[in-house]
Amino acid sequence: MATSVSTIGAANKAPLSLNNSVAGTSVPSTAFFGKTLKKVYGKGVSSPKVTNRSLRIAAEEKDADPKKQTYSDRWKGLVQDFSDDQQDIARGKGMVDSLFQAPTGTGTHHAVLQSYEYVSQGLRQYNMDNTLDGFYIAPSFMDKLVVHITKNFLKLPNIKVPLILGVWGGKGQGKSFQCELVFRKMGINPIMMSAGELESGNAGEPAKLIRQRYREAAEIIRKGNICCLFINDLDAGAGRMGGTTQYTVNNQMVNATLMNIADNPTNVQLPGMYNKQENARVPIIVTGNDFSTLYAPLIRDGRMEKFYWAPTREDRIGVCKGIFRTDNVPEEAVIKIVDTFPGQSIDFFGALRARVYDDEVRKWVSGTGIEAIGDKLLNSFDGPPTFEQPKMTVEKLLEYGNMLVQEQENVKRVQLAETYLKEAALGDANADAINTGNF
């Protein structure tokens, strides 16, 4: 019988004894195979009560065949792997190097996925779905925004990625709305700014606000949530529209601040303080109608990547299908409406849909009475009125569309401002109505 002896008391180097008992033969240290301990006491000892200052405790191996006992060892799973997922995908074929084994409960020897689940996940492909809640996102628009935002979070070797993406194009083409759809698609809650915040009565306030919003977005990214800074109509707040606008200190500071952030995106400081810790890089998305009004060094290629948004016929049809998606307008009717007004912006079709409700509102006003409109809308216990969805036919939509086009033409053709400057009276203000017989 092999026993291992532990000693208590550093001063006594002789074998310890209890009631004049002699210690057994010591056993060299070996791997511990057993799962139980057996205490051995000397002859004449009936209880483990200690009466002397010395004590001997021996551990004894259980009488068992070492080969048979190894297969019943509870730690065997750390070396050998018999789980279904490992065998099915032929990774190790039941034997996995202990280097890749984790502690019990977290190791690869616990089956998590079957082989068909591994295959299904491996075959899963990324789908560039360009719809969100029934709204259409132009593929080229989504591609530009997604690639730009993704590039700014990647560390590409020896590549300088522009921090700012400038989306510009004609009025009412849905630039801001398309950006918001892409943000929602990517799960981004952007930090928003508008052109009205780029001017202030105090010099330097807009530039400071840009830095504050940028650092706010950087803090969101530091916490693990993707974010970006979105500035609407940058050219309206920081651009120069000929002689109609005055170039102020704040215009200059806004352009200079954006240039500085684009050059040092991870070192954006607030005025009056300096923090050595770098902030996260935040991609900036700006929209506008004409970037030629901006400061030229700001829009150079190294700082701003420019994207001209001009929706194609397919894009216009896709967006209009989203506008009329709840009105049961057939696709053929939407295509006909888009082709009838090819030169109109996308915003035109939203205004066209709103015009259809004019008849319903007019009926409610005539039934309620003009004097009681305020009470019915604001002070009624029943709340504001609700309308049944009017039926939208192609004929009605085309009729209202032609009315909107005529109003646009009147604004461009009549130009009363020039007449007012020339004469004190109306002059030819009513000439258009007289010629058309509507005077």
UniProtKB/Swiss-Prot annotation:
Function noted in UniProt: Activation of RuBisCO (ribulose-1,5-bisphosphate carboxylase/oxygenase; EC 4.1.1.39) involves the ATP-dependent carboxylation of the epsilon-amino group of lysine leading to a carbamate structure.
Q: Which UniProt keywords apply?
A: ATP-binding, Chloroplast, Nucleotide-binding, Plastid, Transit peptide
Q: Which InterPro entries match?
A: ATPase_AAA_core, P-loop_NTPase, RCA-like, RuBisCO_activase_AAA_helical
Residues reported to bind ATP: G169, G170, K171, G172, Q173, G174, K175, S176
Q: Which superkingdom is the protein from?
A: Eukaryota
Recorded source organism is Nicotiana tabacum
State the gene name recorded for this protein: RCA
- In the database record, which residues form the transit peptide? 1-58
Q: What is this protein called?
A: Ribulose bisphosphate carboxylase/oxygenase activase 2, chloroplastic
The Gene Ontology CC terms held by the record are: chloroplast stroma
Q: Which family does it belong to?
A: Belongs to the RuBisCO activase family.
Q: Which GO terms describe its molecular function?
A: ATP binding; ATP hydrolysis activity; ribulose-1,5-bisphosphate carboxylase/oxygenase activator activity
What are the subcellular locations of this protein?
A: Plastid, Chloroplast stroma
